Amino acid sequence: MKKYGAPQISSGDLLRDAVARGTELGLRAKAAMDAGELVSDELVLALIRERLSRPDALRGFILDGFPRNIAQAEALSDMLGRLGQPIDAVVLMNVDSAALLKRLTGRRTCSRCGRLFNVYTSPPTADTPCVDGRLEHQLVQRPDDNEDTIRNRLDVYAAQTRPLVEHYRGRGLLRTVEAEGDIEDVFARLERAVTPPAVRRSRKPRR
C-alpha cells in the first residue's frame, strides 16, 4: 500500500507464488488450493514467517487473507509478540454472499499487464488499453474462481473463519467495513475504520 508505506502481504499470493515456483511448500499446498480448501496452518505460517522477516515489513505491514482460523490467529499473535509488532486493527470486509459469488466468478486478470477486471462489473474497454498499447487484453481466470469451488470456500469460511469475528471483537480490535459499492467509496470507509478519531480530526481543514 503505497499511501501508507507498508507492504500488502496476501497469504493467497504467497501460496500461488510458491505453487508457481514448484517449491516444496507450494507442491504440498496445490491440492488443497485447487479444491478450495484451507491450506494447513503449518504451511501458511511458514510462508508468512518468511515474508515478515524481509526489511520492508519491519516498520509495519497489512496482512490480507490471514489468519483464517483461531489456531492461525493465536500463532500470529505469538509470532508478532516475538517481533515486537502487536496487531493494531483487524478489518472485516463485509460482502453479501451473492455479490461475492458474482465478484469472484467474474474476476479476470490480463496475462500481459496483470490488470484486474470483472466481466460483470468492470470489463475492459477501449479506454483501458493493455500495457503494450493493444486494445485487447488477454484475460485469464484463476482455476479456483469457479462457482463450485467458491461455494465450498464460503462453507469453509462459515465453519473456520467466522469464529475469528468474535475472537477479535472480544479483544477490541475488530473494524467492520461494508465492502459493496464503488472502489473509492469502499476505500474511504476503510480509511475511516482504521484511522484513529484524533487523527481524523487533525486532518480536517481549519477555518
Could you describe each region identified by the protein language model?
Residues 1-207:
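Glycine-rich phosphate-binding loop of ATP-dependent small-molecule kinases
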